């Protein structure tokens, strides 16, 4: 009994992470010309990330664990995801997404961050970890969300970011994003980034 309680206490001390697999259910998110749907990749990466962070000793939560929306209303769905930050008292909120752009040559993961120092600091660390561990040709920089991304504009004090893992509009990157090996590389980069941020 005591050992279990102690383990949970230690787990909480390591940090609380809320993982948000973007979209879900009736909301598929972006779709590639080959028919790849964003929501499925988001969930696949998020589930792998939860497992990896659990193994690291973090206390982790998911906003969704299956192909479901939190509400049929888009506004309510996003509000419910934001509310989970306060409910879990998370140190880090990371929303997993995939990008899409008319220009097919665009590639590379990019981090968007909420308007606070915790988010900026984590975004810088995470963007560098993605460059180092996933693709050193990726010259993208972390960007402030400003008026974009409602999920980052709720005023939460913890580190809140959206990670666009890559571009479904780039055929080569799309194929990578669908593969378990590449998803594991992304997960590894995120875990390294979280570990570095949580040390500070």
Predicted features, each with a name:
Residues 1-17, 21:
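Boundary/activation segment at the start of structured domains
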Residues 15-35:
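Short glycine-rich His-centered loop
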Residues 6-12, 36, 40-200:
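Active-site-proximal helix/loop segments of hydrolytic enzymes
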């Amino acid at each position: 009994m005591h050992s279990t309680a102690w383990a949970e206490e230690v787990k909480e001390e390591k940090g609380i992470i809320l993982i948000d697999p973007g979209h879900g259910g009736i909301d598929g998110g972006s779709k590639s010309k080959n028919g790849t749907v964003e929501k499925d990749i988001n969930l696949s990466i998020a589930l792998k990330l939860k497992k990896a962070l659990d193994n690291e000793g973090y206390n982790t939560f998911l906003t969704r664990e299956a192909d479901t929306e939190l509400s049929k209303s888009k506004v309510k769905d996003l509000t419910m995801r934001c509310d989970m930050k306060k409910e879990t008292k998370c140190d880090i909120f990371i929303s997993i997404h995939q990008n899409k752009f008319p220009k097919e040559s665009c590639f590379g993961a990019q981090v968007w961050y909420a308007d606070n120092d915790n988010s900026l600091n984590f975004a810088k660390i995470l963007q560098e970890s993605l460059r180092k561990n996933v693709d050193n040709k990726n010259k993208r920089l972390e960007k402030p969300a400003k008026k974009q991304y409602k999920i980052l504009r709720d005023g939460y004090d913890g580190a809140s970011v959206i990670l666009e893992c890559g571009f479904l509009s780039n055929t080569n990157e799309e194929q990578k994003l669908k593969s378990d090996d590449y998803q594991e590389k992304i997960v590894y980069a995120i875990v390294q980034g979280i570990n570095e941020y949580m040390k500070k």
